């Protein structure tokens, strides 16, 4: 992420309080979210960052509060976001960051409930308390809580976000960073002709994916698939594993109705590291 992009993103988050980082697989959404939180804090304080992952079974009871089985029957238990907000309210001079991975996998209306209104930037604070569903407690979202949602744009099985929720978030798209100054320095440190050749091939593949009417830029392959190497550790086996077990299966899903295209690009990827 460039310095200009970072400044834009921090400005959005400060103003809106709620941001969704969206992008193709492997563009570094999780890394960017945590880095954004720590940089806005000015210190790496993991105690002020919480991350949850939404899924189809995730509910209001997990997020806010609900009754859970206990030895004596059922008892009211507090959810992750409720507990996080209470902690932030007791420390209102410092910023807190709540990260939601796969935010578009959950039933958002069901999960957020009455908090749809409370997460808005101008509905924060004690003066906007609302009564919770089960406990009848009057609850508010503190102004020092920032929400960062992460959304994979290449998952075709997911519905579009609820418009009511979409209005309450700013959306920031992360793209593959192969041409960024940071990744260029990383390539120089890796110092591998085969690695460079594979990255160049993937860049051409991304051009093909972006121009495909059934796919588009949201399906491009991110740079994170190729991170983690240090100088001298790149070998044919590790690059081949990325191709065979990560990239080619993905292409099989993308072009399930065009196996010839999958075959041609699979061969191109394999040739790139020969």
Predicted regions, residues:
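C-terminal regulatory/interaction module of P-loop NTP-utilizing enzymes
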Residues: 1-274
């Amino acid at each position: 992420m460039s310095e200009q992009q970072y400044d834009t993103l921090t400005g959005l988050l400060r103003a809106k309080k709620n941001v969704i980082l969206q992008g193709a697989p492997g563009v570094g959404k999780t890394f960017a979210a945590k880095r954004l939180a720590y940089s806005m804090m000015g210190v790496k304080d993991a105690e002020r960052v919480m991350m949850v992952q939404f899924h189809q079974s995730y509910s209001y009871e997990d997020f806010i509060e609900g009754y859970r089985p206990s030895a004596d029957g059922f008892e009211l238990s507090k959810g992750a976001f409720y507990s996080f907000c209470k902690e932030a309210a007791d420390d209102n001079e410092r910023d807190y960051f709540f990260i939601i991975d796969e935010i578009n996998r959950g039933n958002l209306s069901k999960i957020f409930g009455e908090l749809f209104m409370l997460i808005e930037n101008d509905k924060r604070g004690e003066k906007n308390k609302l009564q919770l569903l089960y406990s009848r407690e009057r609850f508010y979202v503190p102004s020092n809580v920032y929400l960062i949602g992460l959304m994979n744009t290449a998952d075709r099985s997911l519905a579009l976000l609820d418009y009511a929720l979409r209005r309450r978030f700013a959306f920031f798209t992360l793209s593959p960073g192969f041409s960024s100054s940071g990744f260029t320095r990383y390539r120089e440190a890796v110092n591998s002709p085969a690695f460079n050749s594979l990255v160049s091939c993937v860049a051409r593949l991304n051009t093909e994916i972006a121009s495909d009417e059934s796919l588009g830029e949201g399906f491009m392959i991110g740079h994170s698939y190729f991170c983690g190497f240090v100088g001298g550790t790149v070998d044919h086996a590790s690059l081949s594993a990325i191709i065979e077990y990560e990239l080619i299966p993905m292409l099989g899903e993308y072009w399930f109705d065009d196996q010839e295209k999958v075959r041609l690009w699979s061969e191109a990827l394999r040739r790139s590291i020969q």
